[in-house]
Amino acid sequence: MSIPNLGKKIIVTVPSTTANLGPGFDCLGAALDLYNEFIFTRIEGDGDRFDLIMESTDGNHLRGGPENLVFRAAQKVWESADVSPFALEARVKLAVPPARGLGSSATAIVAGLIGANAIMNSPLPKEKLLELAIDIEGHPDNVVPSLLGGLCLTARSSSQRWRIIRCDWHDSIKAVIAIPAIRLSTSEARRVMPKNIPISDAVTNMGALTLLLNGLKTGNDELIKEGMFDKLHEPYRWKLIKGGLEVKEAALQAGALGCAISGAGPSILALCKSNNGKVVSQAMVKAWENLGIASRAPFLNVQTKGSQFKTISGK
């Protein structure tokens, strides 16, 4: 396979994600219409050269150099396609804040895979990119919806194959994501979880997940209220999020159908009907404000197209 011409440029747009949604720990996630944009350009130099240029209005940043997730993902593509690495520049426009539970790491992984693949005229199929993305991230709940879009349930089957189910999301159900000006790493959020759980907690979560998925499919308020409940991770993680339970209670009092930690946190997801999203958003921001924490709570739609790319110069 030939190395792309100097100057070839690919633009990749990757949606943010909210994972778990309460009971769907490490298997359920939805893509949202908040995006990071990555522009990849073939530049002069060998495969060890990877230039990362970030544009952000709020001080967010990604780690540069060979350890960067974008570069690591690109390397996986080169290895899988059996090609020699080549020099790349990645210009990143950040809108998805890192360490907030919105899948910023997943956007970097997915962008690196798609960008490196597309700049070589896409030798790897999407199924292979999904496999690589899950391998790099270590769990599927962010990278799968980030790549495919929509609400995705991903599980490893008895044959050890990843099975992905695209689940329905009723048009009447909207998402409010309260994003505080504090950070929480996924590794820290995982450290507080127990290594073993009671069987009763596992059974509770299986039932809750079934109720939630049916509620999201049909738009049934009661099923969403009863299904957005977790016993596996949230009881241990709420204590890491200052004011988290107060924000959750404020959202529910304002009419939210359900509330959960978005991914590993600290952002908080509230599901609501479209006619009361503004009230829920204001209540969540106010609850954090009362504790001296700045936040914003955008009203977001589920993004169904997943990651997109286009060639803007070169062949």
Curated annotation (Swiss-Prot):
<dbReference type="Pfam" id="PF08544">
    <property type="entry name" value="GHMP_kinases_C"/>
</dbReference>
<protein>
    <recommendedName>
        <fullName>Homoserine kinase</fullName>
        <ecNumber>2.7.1.39</ecNumber>
    </recommendedName>
</protein>
<dbReference type="InterPro" id="IPR006203">
    <property type="entry name" value="GHMP_knse_ATP-bd_CS"/>
</dbReference>
<dbReference type="GO" id="GO:0005524">
    <property type="term" value="F:ATP binding"/>
</dbReference>
<keyword id="KW-0963">Cytoplasm</keyword>
<dbReference type="Pfam" id="PF00288">
    <property type="entry name" value="GHMP_kinases_N"/>
</dbReference>
<dbReference type="InterPro" id="IPR006204">
    <property type="entry name" value="GHMP_kinase_N_dom"/>
</dbReference>
<keyword id="KW-0418">Kinase</keyword>
<dbReference type="GO" id="GO:0005737">
    <property type="term" value="C:cytoplasm"/>
</dbReference>
<keyword id="KW-0547">Nucleotide-binding</keyword>
<comment type="pathway">
    <text>Amino-acid biosynthesis; L-threonine biosynthesis; L-threonine from L-aspartate: step 4/5.</text>
</comment>
<comment type="function">
    <text>Catalyzes the ATP-dependent phosphorylation of L-homoserine to L-homoserine phosphate.</text>
</comment>
<keyword id="KW-0808">Transferase</keyword>
<dbReference type="InterPro" id="IPR020568">
    <property type="entry name" value="Ribosomal_Su5_D2-typ_SF"/>
</dbReference>
<dbReference type="InterPro" id="IPR000870">
    <property type="entry name" value="Homoserine_kinase"/>
</dbReference>
<dbReference type="GO" id="GO:0009088">
    <property type="term" value="P:threonine biosynthetic process"/>
</dbReference>
<keyword id="KW-0791">Threonine biosynthesis</keyword>
<dbReference type="GO" id="GO:0004413">
    <property type="term" value="F:homoserine kinase activity"/>
</dbReference>
<dbReference type="InterPro" id="IPR036554">
    <property type="entry name" value="GHMP_kinase_C_sf"/>
</dbReference>
<feature type="binding site">
    <location>
        <begin position="97"/>
        <end position="107"/>
    </location>
    <ligand>
        <name>ATP</name>
    </ligand>
</feature>
<keyword id="KW-0067">ATP-binding</keyword>
<comment type="similarity">
    <text>Belongs to the GHMP kinase family. Homoserine kinase subfamily.</text>
</comment>
<keyword id="KW-0028">Amino-acid biosynthesis</keyword>
<dbReference type="InterPro" id="IPR013750">
    <property type="entry name" value="GHMP_kinase_C_dom"/>
</dbReference>
<dbReference type="InterPro" id="IPR014721">
    <property type="entry name" value="Ribsml_uS5_D2-typ_fold_subgr"/>
</dbReference>
